[in-house]
């Protein structure tokens, strides 16, 4: 009997030691326009070696330690950078990844107070978080942001490029400054962050990058020529980055949200809401958590290790 118990304990210990960076998580939003127009600015089409959720590993390691008295090697939590993470979809993504056990850098442009609140929520879940104020369309800010994460935690495993803006107007009225603002942040910002992250990930031969685009980048939308061009650019850019990073085990994917519930959609009024919902086959808005769940899957799940260069719509069926 004693021999059987000892053998069982040894087998359990070996199983836990083999976990490595495995993750056992389940998969769990069109962000509103900056104007009252009922269009797709309300739409945010925002590694083979997998990462582990610390709570899963801790639970199994504790069980083995209690039965054997032996310590199990610590599995480090993934380090994640989320841009535009102080509110909306970005906030939901940061919270989801923080709850999953990640160490999260919460990037913001102007909303310092909101970013601090997100950071505190992550810490309340038992995770770790830091905030960083910076404009991702500026190379110096991006370099400083990545350095902040590395100085704090030693590496970067996942980058989620979510930061974005809208400057909506019809093409014939659009000023070059409105075009430039959207392209600079929504497309050039993704380029700069992806480039900086790839340099880090190539050295470690592992990493995952998720870029938030929009259904608008796939089907277009009246009054959003700048936004549609930027988001379509993100999709094409991501496919190229995926091809270039594949040999170094770097996965790059795109998430394209449709209409996502927000403070802005809540102010549209009943008539406008009916018109919008009439364009959505599922007949309802998505939730920020819907997008966050898909991002979490692509960022952490072992089941996503063979997925790269793909653009996933999460839009209630608008792009069918």
Curated annotation (Swiss-Prot):
The reaction(s) annotated as catalysed by this protein in its Swiss-Prot or TrEMBL entry are:
a (3R)-hydroxyacyl-[ACP] + NADP(+) = a 3-oxoacyl-[ACP] + NADPH + H(+)
**Class in the EC hierarchy, top level:** oxidoreductase
Protein family (similarity comment): Belongs to the short-chain dehydrogenases/reductases (SDR) family.
Which gene name does the record give?
gbkr1
The name of this protein is: 3-oxoacyl-[acyl-carrier-protein] reductase 1, chloroplastic
One Gene Ontology biological process? fatty acid biosynthetic process
Give GO terms: molecular function aspect only: 3-oxoacyl-[acyl-carrier-protein] reductase (NADPH) activity; NAD binding
Q: Does the record bear Membrane in its keywords?
A: no
One GO cellular component term noted in the UniProt record for this chain:
chloroplast
Subunit structure and binding partners: Homotetramer.
């Amino acid at each position: 009997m004693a021999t059987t118990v000892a053998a069982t304990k040894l087998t359990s210990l070996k199983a836990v030691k083999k976990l490595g960076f495995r993750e056992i998580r389940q998969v769990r939003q069109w962000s509103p326009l900056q104007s009252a127009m009922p269009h797709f600015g309300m739409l945010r089409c925002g590694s083979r070696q997998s990462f582990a959720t610390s709570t899963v590993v801790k639970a199994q390691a504790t069980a083995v330690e209690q039965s054997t008295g032996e310590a199990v090697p610590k599995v480090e939590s993934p380090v994640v950078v989320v841009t535009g993470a102080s509110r909306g979809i970005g906030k939901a993504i940061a919270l989801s990844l923080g709850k999953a056990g990640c160490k999260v850098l919460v990037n913001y442009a102007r909303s310092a107070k909101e970013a601090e609140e997100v950071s505190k929520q992550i810490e309340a879940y038992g995770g770790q978080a830091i905030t960083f104020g910076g404009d991702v369309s500026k190379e110096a800010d991006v370099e400083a942001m990545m350095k902040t994460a590395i100085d704090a935690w030693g590496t970067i495993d996942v980058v989620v490029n979510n930061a974005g803006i809208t400057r909506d107007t019809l093409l014939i009225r659009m000023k070059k400054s409105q075009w430039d603002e959207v392209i600079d942040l929504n497309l050039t910002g993704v380029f700069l962050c992806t480039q900086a992250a790839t340099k880090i990930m190539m050295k470690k031969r592992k990493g995952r990058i998720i870029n938030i685009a929009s259904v608008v980048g796939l089907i277009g939308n009246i009054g959003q020529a700048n936004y549609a061009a930027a988001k379509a650019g993100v999709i094409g850019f991501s496919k190229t980055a995926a091809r270039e990073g594949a040999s170094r085990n770097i996965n790059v994917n795109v998430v394209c949200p449709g209409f996502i519930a927000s403070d802005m959609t809540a102010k549209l009024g009943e008539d406008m809401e009916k018109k919008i919902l009439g364009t959505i086959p599922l007949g309802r808005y998505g939730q920020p958590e819907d997008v966050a769940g898909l991002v979490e899957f692509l960022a952490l799940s072992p089941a996503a290790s063979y997925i790269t260069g793909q653009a996933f719509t999460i839009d209630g069926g608008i792009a069918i």
